[in-house]
Amino acid sequence: MTEYLFTSESVSEGHPDKIADQISDAVLDAILEKDLKARVACETLVKTGMVVIAGEIGTSTWVDLEDLVRKTICTIGYTHSEMGFDGRTCAVLNAIGKQSGDIAQGVDRGEAKLQGAGDQGLMFGYACTETPTLMPAPITYAHRLVEKQAQLRHSGALPWLRPDAKSQITFRYRDNTIVGVDAIVLSTQHSEEISLKELTEAVREEIIAPIVPSKWIDKKTRFHINPTGKFVIGGPLGDCGLTGRKIIVDTYGGAARHGGGAFSGKDPSKVDRSAAYAARYVAKNVVAAGLATRCEVQLSYAIGIAEPTSIMVNTFGTGTIDDAEIVRRVQAVFDLTPYGIIEMLDLVRPIYQKTAVYGHFGRELPQFTWEKTDRSDALQQA
């Protein structure tokens, strides 16, 4: 009998790195709304009283980026200097340039089907049977905790909540099956007047209790709520935020490997993003097809080349058929060229700002086509 602990974390929409991710994807969506052929690589930095957007964009349209940045920050909830950041008054610096012609010539081919990868790289996708959405439980519940914090803040139910928050949850496993929750950490920014005792009670009753099933909570479960005792200074006043700094939060919470490429601010010609979505789509369909209870998929690409340079499937001994046979079926069922992925998942749409918080995977929204299991039958029959 094997027992172990596994932990994942998440952060709220008001965390500095997530502010940056949301701004980068807001820029991408705003441009795609007007120009579906645009090439976008937008990075964001946020710090006290300041936002810097930088990167490379190739487009025929114009977007008021300063106004967009301010609206994004205000929607998150930073609307007053008392919170340490105010979207209405912060400085917005624009350092965006044009995409390199050397890159464009390898990506933009005369025939769309020949479109090459925008860069070299390796991407991973993962699925398992721990949750109904075929995601690992630790990252799933970590996301739900900070999402609940945001819901209560936006609704006004807990008016002392502020935008910045973090969660972490540790599960106990026995023979790869969840048997309980060992620890929950939740830190939330708050206004000055709330006491730690009141905050702790409210967080346990209003955030944790509705999200984490009581069957997993026992006398051994430890709760760490605002363990430093005070969290008034938060957001960009407390820490600098950068696009792409929460890549494990964005994916599988450490339960699967990561190729290193971030997602936000990148149009779907960038395989860092589109191929990672495709790898999740493949892995989820493999598990949904009953071919395995755990599946990790690796894809890799070379700049300017359409076909992936490698495809790997690992089912960790849970496969009902050989992993090499699953690879053969994947190649038969999925077109994993950049063009094939974009068409298969309908990625040239302004859908990306929604992905920038609470995880790119495991959220079965209509826009998140990579969460469908519509190719599981084809995998069974291939």
From Swiss-Prot:
PANTHER family: S-ADENOSYLMETHIONINE SYNTHETASE (PTHR11964). K(+) binds at residue 43. Its main location: cytoplasm. L-methionine binds at residues 56, 99, 239, 270. PROSITE patterns: ADOMET_SYNTHASE_1, ADOMET_SYNTHASE_2. Belongs to the AdoMet synthase family. The lineage of its organism: Bacteria, Pseudomonadati, Pseudomonadota, Gammaproteobacteria, Cardiobacteriales. GO terms for molecular function: ATP binding; magnesium ion binding; methionine adenosyltransferase activity. Residues 99-109 are annotated as: Flexible loop. InterPro entries: ADOMET_SYNTHASE_CS, S-AdoMet_synt_C, S-AdoMet_synt_central, S-AdoMet_synt_N, S-AdoMet_synthetase, S-AdoMet_synthetase_sfam. Mg(2+) binds at residue 17. It is found in: Cytoplasm. Binds 2 divalent ions per subunit. Keywords: ATP-binding, Cytoplasm, Magnesium, Metal-binding, Nucleotide-binding, One-carbon metabolism, Potassium, Transferase. GO terms for cellular component: cytoplasm. The keyword Transit peptide does not apply. Disulfide bonds: none annotated. Its EC number is 2.5.1.6. Pathway: Amino-acid biosynthesis; S-adenosyl-L-methionine biosynthesis; S-adenosyl-L-methionine from L-methionine: step 1/1. This is S-adenosylmethionine synthase. It comes from Dichelobacter nodosus (strain VCS1703A).
